[in-house]
Amino acid sequence: GWRWRSDAPIQSLPHMTSSQAVTFMMVEEHLKHLLPPSLISEMNPWFDLAKRSLSTQNNVRQWINRVRIVPATQPVIPPLVERQAQQSIYEGLLQDKQIECIYRSRGHLGEEKSYILNPLGLVQKGAIIYLICTRLDKSDVQTFALHRFKSATVLDTRAMHPVDFDIDSYIDSGALGFRVDFSKPTENIELKLIMHEDDAQYFTESQLSKNQKVEALNDQLYQISAVVPFTSQLVWWLRSFGKKLVRIEPVEVFNAVHEIES
């Protein structure tokens, strides 16, 4: 791709406002790994221009040094992603083409299999990026972790899309929270938690769902109720509260949190 000359006077370059420059720098910092190489190549000159535009604006430049995004859970180092495979996957998604790949399954054996995939979307969850797709031999929507791709090639054939697929609806269904029972689809449950008043305060600030209710049972205990997907992620999250949870309903969620065989 092309770049602005490093010695070009700032006056000769296209004008970029302070807010535009900050936005480009934030995009480069936080979203660059989610963009296909062809778009990055086109945007690199604008990233350069943003840096140069802010070089003379100390107060705005300091904004970049004063804003950070930190994970809500234990931070981990992102797994290594095979660069060529990542580039092909991104280009396949961008061009709406099928991808032929070799993918390593999870587990210590790490069995490698070949697939032809129809890319539908990308989702970053924590340190891991997932490709949402369907396989040529199966119609159900699946997730493939990017770091487990050994290789990938963009095919000339057009990707096939499920008729009713919507990435936001897919995420809202709890699919990326991962199923508690892989033999069954994710289901919504009416979760009820009983906690002491101080602990329940958390849910008045950050709701589990739009239909969440927080009710006082007595002077000390509160009940939080909400309809949420029953996923492994929900189970892990509830475990993090430890003894703060006086009661959990329904019983299948209680059993999963406490690892009780049902």
Question: For each of these PLM feature ranges, what is it?
Answer:
Residues 1-7:
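Minor-groove-contacting beta-hairpin "wing" of winged helix-turn-helix DNA-binding domains
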Residues 1, 98, 128, 218-225:
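A generic structural signal for beta-strand entry/edge sites
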Residues 172-262:
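Polybasic (Lys/Arg-rich)
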Residues 16, 138-141, 249:
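Short alpha-helix boundary/capping segments
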Residues 27-28, 46-50, 149, 238-242, ...:
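Short amphipathic C-terminal alpha-helix that caps PH/PH-like domains
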Residues 12-104:
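Bulky hydrophobic/aromatic content
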